[in-house]
A protein has these predicted regions:
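Charged, low-complexity interaction regions
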Residues: 32-39, 100-102
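Charged alpha-helical initiation segments
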Residues: 1-36, 138
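Generic low-complexity, intrinsically disordered sequence content enriched
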Residues: 24, 31-33, 42, 115, ...
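Long, charged low-complexity segments
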Residues: 2-8, 14, 51, 55-138
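Amphipathic, well-ordered alpha-helical segments in soluble domains
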Residues: 19-26, 49, 118, 122
Length: 138
């Protein structure tokens, strides 16, 4: 009987998938809103949850936050694609909730949708790559 081996524990996997589901639900709610303030708020929440899903898929989100802060202050690892993506999502979240940001509902939703889609692909691929089936010992 094959055994499943995973670099990530079930706790991290379940949180990554949960945050993806919640990001999708918040995005869906944002699409139904008429108020631009609610659209901005729900879109930002959706993007943050999508970002957290990525962080859980790659390990402890607290460590990821620390690595991001180190990369931003010291410049080390700043060219790493995952660090750059998390940094860009942070910027996008801040921009979305900024009262000076005057984009319309459609543009905000496109930004949130693209963030969710990218996060979803990354999380699912990470979970697939970090789990594999190992045969039994004879």
């Amino acid at each position: 009987m094959p055994l499943e081996f995973s670099i990530l524990d079930e706790f991290m996997k379940s949180w990554a998938l949960r945050y993806l589901r919640e990001a999708e639900a918040d995005l869906s709610l944002a699409k139904e809103c008429d108020s631009i303030e609610l659209v901005k708020e729900l879109s930002a929440i959706s993007m943050r949850k999508a970002q957290l899903a990525i962080q859980y898929a790659f390990g402890d989100p607290n460590i990821m936050e620390y690595i991001l802060e180190e990369a931003l202050t010291k410049g080390s690892l700043r060219k790493e694609p995952l660090i750059r993506l998390i940094e860009k999502i942070n910027i996008l979240i801040k921009k979305t909730v900024d009262p000076q940001f005057t984009a319309g509902k459609d543009k905000i939703l496109v930004l949130a949708e693209k963030t969710f889609e990218a996060s979803s692909i990354i999380v699912k691929e990470a979970l697939k790559r970090f789990s594999f089936v190992k045969g039994e010992k004879n």
